[in-house]
Protein backbone atom coordinates (compact mmCIF):
# COMPACT_ATOMS: atom_id res chain seq x y z
CA UNK A 1 0.00 0.00 0.00
CA UNK A 2 1.34 3.40 -0.97
CA UNK A 3 0.76 6.15 1.59
CA UNK A 4 1.84 9.78 1.76
CA UNK A 5 2.21 11.10 5.30
CA UNK A 6 2.48 14.80 5.99
CA UNK A 7 1.63 17.26 8.74
CA UNK A 8 1.70 20.93 9.63
CA UNK A 9 0.85 22.28 6.19
CA UNK A 10 -0.81 25.35 7.77
CA UNK A 11 -2.83 26.49 4.77
CA UNK A 12 -4.28 30.00 5.02
CA UNK A 13 -1.72 31.21 7.55
CA UNK A 14 -1.43 34.92 8.28
CA UNK A 15 2.38 34.64 8.02
CA UNK A 16 2.52 38.08 9.61
CA UNK A 17 5.69 37.72 11.66
CA UNK A 18 8.29 38.33 8.95
CA UNK A 19 6.49 38.81 5.63
CA UNK A 20 4.66 41.71 4.09
CA UNK A 21 1.01 41.17 3.25
CA UNK A 22 1.89 40.67 -0.44
CA UNK A 23 4.71 38.22 0.40
CA UNK A 24 2.39 36.31 2.75
CA UNK A 25 -0.28 36.06 0.04
CA UNK A 26 2.30 34.78 -2.45
CA UNK A 27 3.64 32.25 0.09
CA UNK A 28 0.12 31.01 0.85
CA UNK A 29 -0.45 30.55 -2.88
CA UNK A 30 2.79 28.54 -3.07
CA UNK A 31 1.71 26.34 -0.15
CA UNK A 32 -1.64 25.64 -1.78
CA UNK A 33 0.01 24.90 -5.15
CA UNK A 34 2.32 22.44 -3.39
CA UNK A 35 -0.70 20.81 -1.75
CA UNK A 36 -2.30 20.39 -5.21
CA UNK A 37 0.96 18.97 -6.60
CA UNK A 38 0.98 16.42 -3.76
CA UNK A 39 -2.58 15.37 -4.60
CA UNK A 40 -1.74 15.13 -8.32
CA UNK A 41 1.35 13.06 -7.51
CA UNK A 42 -0.68 10.75 -5.29
CA UNK A 43 -3.21 10.08 -8.03
CA UNK A 44 -0.58 9.68 -10.76
CA UNK A 45 1.49 7.24 -8.65
CA UNK A 46 -1.58 5.29 -7.49
CA UNK A 47 -1.10 6.21 -3.84
CA UNK A 48 -3.97 4.73 -1.81
CA UNK A 49 -4.14 7.45 0.84
CA UNK A 50 -2.73 10.79 1.92
CA UNK A 51 -2.58 11.11 5.71
CA UNK A 52 -2.37 14.61 7.17
CA UNK A 53 -1.42 14.20 10.82
CA UNK A 54 -2.63 17.57 12.05
CA UNK A 55 -2.74 21.23 11.10
CA UNK A 56 -3.82 21.12 7.49
CA UNK A 57 -5.04 24.66 8.20
CA UNK A 58 -3.39 27.32 10.33
CA UNK A 59 -6.53 28.24 12.23
CA UNK A 60 -9.93 26.82 13.07
CA UNK A 61 -11.34 30.17 11.93
CA UNK A 62 -9.78 30.07 8.47
CA UNK A 63 -11.46 31.43 5.39
CA UNK A 64 -14.30 29.34 4.02
CA UNK A 65 -13.05 29.91 0.46
CA UNK A 66 -9.74 28.18 1.24
CA UNK A 67 -11.48 25.22 2.89
CA UNK A 68 -13.76 24.86 -0.12
CA UNK A 69 -10.73 24.90 -2.46
CA UNK A 70 -9.25 22.05 -0.42
CA UNK A 71 -12.50 20.10 -0.64
CA UNK A 72 -12.63 20.66 -4.40
CA UNK A 73 -9.05 19.37 -4.69
CA UNK A 74 -9.92 16.27 -2.67
CA UNK A 75 -13.03 15.65 -4.78
CA UNK A 76 -10.94 16.02 -7.96
CA UNK A 77 -8.77 13.05 -6.85
CA UNK A 78 -11.40 10.38 -6.07
CA UNK A 79 -8.99 7.42 -6.29
CA UNK A 80 -6.98 8.77 -3.33
CA UNK A 81 -8.37 8.72 0.20
CA UNK A 82 -7.53 11.89 2.11
CA UNK A 83 -7.31 11.16 5.84
CA UNK A 84 -7.15 14.27 7.99
CA UNK A 85 -6.58 14.52 11.72
CA UNK A 86 -7.25 17.83 13.39
CA UNK A 87 -4.28 19.50 15.03
CA UNK A 88 -3.74 22.11 17.69
CA UNK A 89 -4.13 24.90 15.11
CA UNK A 90 -7.10 23.83 12.97
CA UNK A 91 -9.19 22.36 15.77
CA UNK A 92 -11.82 19.68 16.14
CA UNK A 93 -14.35 21.16 13.68
CA UNK A 94 -12.02 20.86 10.70
CA UNK A 95 -14.69 21.21 8.04
CA UNK A 96 -17.50 22.37 10.35
CA UNK A 97 -19.28 19.05 9.93
CA UNK A 98 -20.52 18.50 13.47
CA UNK A 99 -24.29 17.96 13.46
CA UNK A 100 -24.77 20.72 16.01
CA UNK A 101 -22.57 23.26 14.19
CA UNK A 102 -25.45 24.48 12.03
CA UNK A 103 -23.16 24.55 9.00
CA UNK A 104 -21.87 21.83 6.73
CA UNK A 105 -19.35 22.52 4.01
CA UNK A 106 -20.20 21.32 0.53
CA UNK A 107 -18.51 21.12 -2.85
CA UNK A 108 -20.64 22.56 -5.63
CA UNK A 109 -23.76 21.93 -3.56
CA UNK A 110 -22.82 18.33 -2.76
CA UNK A 111 -21.82 16.91 0.60
CA UNK A 112 -18.21 16.27 1.59
CA UNK A 113 -16.24 14.08 -0.85
CA UNK A 114 -16.47 10.34 -0.12
CA UNK A 115 -12.68 10.09 -0.20
CA UNK A 116 -12.33 12.62 2.64
CA UNK A 117 -11.84 10.63 5.84
CA UNK A 118 -11.98 12.47 9.15
CA UNK A 119 -11.36 11.20 12.66
CA UNK A 120 -14.20 12.47 14.84
CA UNK A 121 -14.00 11.18 18.38
CA UNK A 122 -11.58 8.67 19.80
CA UNK A 123 -10.60 5.53 18.00
CA UNK A 124 -12.04 6.11 14.50
CA UNK A 125 -10.24 3.74 12.15
CA UNK A 126 -10.03 3.07 8.42
CA UNK A 127 -9.01 -0.37 7.15
CA UNK A 128 -7.01 -1.06 3.99
CA UNK A 129 -6.63 -4.84 3.92
CA UNK A 130 -4.55 -5.63 6.98
CA UNK A 131 -3.44 -2.01 7.41
CA UNK A 132 -5.50 -0.04 9.91
CA UNK A 133 -5.13 3.72 10.27
CA UNK A 134 -6.53 5.02 13.54
CA UNK A 135 -6.58 8.70 14.37
CA UNK A 136 -6.66 9.92 17.93
CA UNK A 137 -5.40 12.71 20.11
CA UNK A 138 -2.48 11.23 22.03
CA UNK A 139 -3.37 13.41 25.01
CA UNK A 140 -6.70 11.58 25.29
CA UNK A 141 -5.86 7.90 24.89
CA UNK A 142 -9.17 6.06 24.66
CA UNK A 143 -9.93 2.96 26.65
CA UNK A 144 -12.16 1.76 23.80
CA UNK A 145 -9.28 1.50 21.31
CA UNK A 146 -8.79 -2.18 20.49
CA UNK A 147 -5.98 -2.90 18.03
CA UNK A 148 -5.37 -6.37 16.61
CA UNK A 149 -1.77 -7.59 16.86
CA UNK A 150 -2.03 -9.32 13.46
CA UNK A 151 -2.77 -6.00 11.74
CA UNK A 152 -0.36 -3.24 10.85
CA UNK A 153 -1.60 -0.44 13.09
Tell me the role of every PLM-derived stretch.
Residues 1-69, 73:
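N-terminal active-site segment of His-dependent metallophosphoesterases
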Residues 49, 58-153:
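His/Asp/Glu-rich metal-coordinating catalytic cores
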Amino acid sequence: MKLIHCADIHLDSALATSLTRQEARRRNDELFETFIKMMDYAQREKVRAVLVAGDLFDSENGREAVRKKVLEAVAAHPQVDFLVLSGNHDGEQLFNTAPDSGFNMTVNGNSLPKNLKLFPGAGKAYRYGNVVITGLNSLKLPSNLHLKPEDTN
